[in-house]
UniProtKB/Swiss-Prot annotation:
Domain of life: Bacteria
Protein keywords: Aminotransferase, Transferase
GO BP field: glycine decarboxylation via glycine cleavage system
GO CC aspect terms: cytosol; glycine cleavage complex
UniProt protein name: Aminomethyltransferase
Function of the molecule: The glycine cleavage system catalyzes the degradation of glycine.
Cystine residue pairs: none
InterPro entries: GCS_T (IPR006223), GCS_T_bac (IPR022903), GCST_C (IPR013977), GCV_T_N (IPR006222), GcvT/YgfZ/DmdA (IPR028896), GcvT/YgfZ_C (IPR029043), TrmE/GcvT_dom1 (IPR027266)
EC number: 2.1.2.10
Pfam families: GCV_T (PF01571), GCV_T_C (PF08669)
């Protein structure tokens, strides 16, 4: 049976085209994916991301546990109200999921996980928590909205209660705050500034309608995908999975090697891979002729094994096709992409195309 978020009837009332997304009935768009994309780049858009998995890790052993569970080190969080992006790996260094962890208190951490990996992630975290002074609480009674774009925070502040305004207006990127059972984080998945807001299910429809009346554009999964691709943000299950490591996914920066005795899960395998050198790397591709790059297409590199496009689409901002691809480390500045049997040249660059709405 397909799952529905508390906003399901609201999406239908807004004219959403609904699609199945890993067992959830979610909006693909509300009439124009292109307009929704541009709204986020130039103004403000909102996404229902209540399908995401919210897990609170409670107890005195929370920090110690997360230092073992994650490749990034939560010891970098120096005070409550800070957030950290990380991979969660298996013993072989394969990526089980990528996530954001928020420190709400010294004994209270919140992690937001991908919906497609909900069962496996929760089971993994629960199994690995044995022996630590922690308890896990999956928060299915909460909904989550992402409000993104250069005007997202200003428009959100215009509809919030005074106590919320005071708390949210001082947030800097990758900070969070709790106010009256509402949780605000200055994080997102679009490459733009904005907020992710977690509220009890019974409040989310009013929040959505208030944002709509403030001029925030409803946006679906289609725009979310092109926005994150332009920003070089990876999609779990496409750009990385348990067969790939952070080092070959452009995520080495999320692995903290020191101190050596931290011994996070997968550390031995990743240290070995680092010492031996990776054979594949993540790059960005820009198509130099007509066509659209898509997931699964071959990347032809002279004198090397083929690479593979992990994510590809048309970029509404750049008005050309862009892609993320995993290729041999020897890959040079130009490759060929096999698009329906035609070999189309593409320029190789960094796996990021847009920063704060501007070409990189």
């Amino acid at each position: 049976m397909t799952a529905k978020t508390p906003l399901h009837t609201t999406h239908l009332a807004c004219g959403a085209k609904m699609v199945d997304f890993h067992g959830w009935d979610m909006p693909l768009h509300y009439g124009s994916q292109l307009n929704e994309h541009h709204a986020v780049r130039n103004d403000a858009g909102m996404f229902d991301v209540s399908h995401m998995t919210i897990v609170d890790i409670l107890g005195a052993g929370g920090r110690q546990f997360l230092r073992k569970l994650l490749t990034n080190d939560v010891d970098q969080i120096t005070h409550n109200g800070k957030a950290l992006y990380s991979c969660m790996c298996n013993e072989h260094g394969g990526i089980i999921d990528d996530l954001i962890v928020y420190q709400r208190a010294s004994d209270n951490y919140r992690v937001v996980l991908n919906s497609a990996t909900r069962q496996n992630d929760v089971a993994w975290i629960r199994a690995k928590s044995e022996g630590f002074a922690v308890g896990l609480q999956e928060r299915r009674e909460l909904s989550m909205l992402a409000v993104q774009g250069p005007n997202a925070i200003a428009k959100t502040l215009s509809i919030l209660a005074p106590a919320h305004v005071d708390a949210v207006s001082t947030l800097t990127p990758f900070e969070c705050v709790d106010v009256d059972h509402w949780f605000f984080a200055r994080t997102g998945y679009t490459g733009e500034d904005g907020l992710e807001i977690i509220v009890p299910n019974e409040f989310v429809t009013q929040l959505w309608n208030d944002l709509l009346n403030a001029g925030v554009t409803p946006c679906g999964l289609g725009a979310r995908d092109t926005l994150r691709l332009e920003a070089g943000m990876l999609l779990y299950g496409q750009d990385m999975d348990e067969t790939t490591t952070p080092l070959e996914s452009g995520l080495t920066w999320t692995v903290k090697w020191e101190p050596e005795d931290r011994g996070f899960i997968g550390m031995g395998a990743l240290v070995s891979q680092k010492q031996q050198g990776i054979k594949r790397k993540m790059v960005g591709l820009t198509l130099l002729d007509k066509g659209i790059m898509r997931h699964g297409q071959k990347v032809i590199i002279e004198g090397c094994p083929d690479g593979i496009i992990t994510s590809g689409s048309y970029s509404p901002t750049l008005q050309q096709s862009i892609a993320l691809a995993r290729v041999p480390v020897e890959t040079g500045e130009q490759v060929l992409v096999d698009i329906r049997g035609k070999l189309i040249p593409a320029k190789v660059g960094k796996p990021r195309f847009i920063k704060q709405g501007k070409p990189v």
